[in-house]
Amino acid sequence: MKNNNPLDYLYPNVQQTSIINKQANLKQTLKGNLWKSIIKAKITNQNLVLEGHGINSLRFKKYISEVKYNDNTGIEAQSAKMYFNLLFGKDFKREQQGTEDTLNIFLNYGYSILRSIIARSITGTGLHPSLGIWHHNQYDPMPLASDLMEPLRPFVDNMIYKYIKNKNDYKFNKEFKEYIARIIIQPTIIKNKAQILDNAVNIYVSSIKNIIIEKNKPYIDLPRIKI
């Protein structure tokens, strides 16, 4: 492991070559529809986080129905700004790697753990993490993990919100790392059943694989956060 990401991939599935070929040749129309479903699920979970903490989200909720094929109207970016301002305050600005802001450091660290969980599940199904649906970045060796983690980011946000809620001061330290590591056991609803997040991720990723292989499975089994 390096920075919570696997250095090597092991593929236990004997049909991996066939699966990866189908993954590499996925039609753009299917990719566009998958991405629409993924972004709708992300915004839905963000809304559940807001509602779960008593934050008025009526304006935010409308974004769920506005997501289009391939998110070609950019609803994800619009909704993200409002979401973070509602959750962490109007002055909060999301920053990526290199930030010195503790809250952003918390988020980035939590997301890196989540991404590693997703990557492990992806390789376990025989899919290849380098073949993304939406993300394509020469510096990202696992764009598929970056894609599939999107609906699960609110699980990290929720844990961090609860962690800082009643603290006047918080630091990136061992206590926080031990706390956020429990992301894998967070309560989740998938296929109308309660699961821990770790199990739900495997169900979710397997459903993506089935869509890629069969090309006629009508929906993704998407995890829903349970506050």
Model feature map: region roles:
Residues M1-N3:
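Short, acidic/turn-prone active-site loops that include or flank metal/cofactor-
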Residues N5-Y9, V14-I227:
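Active-site helix-to-loop segments that bind/position phosphate- or nucleotide-bearing substrates
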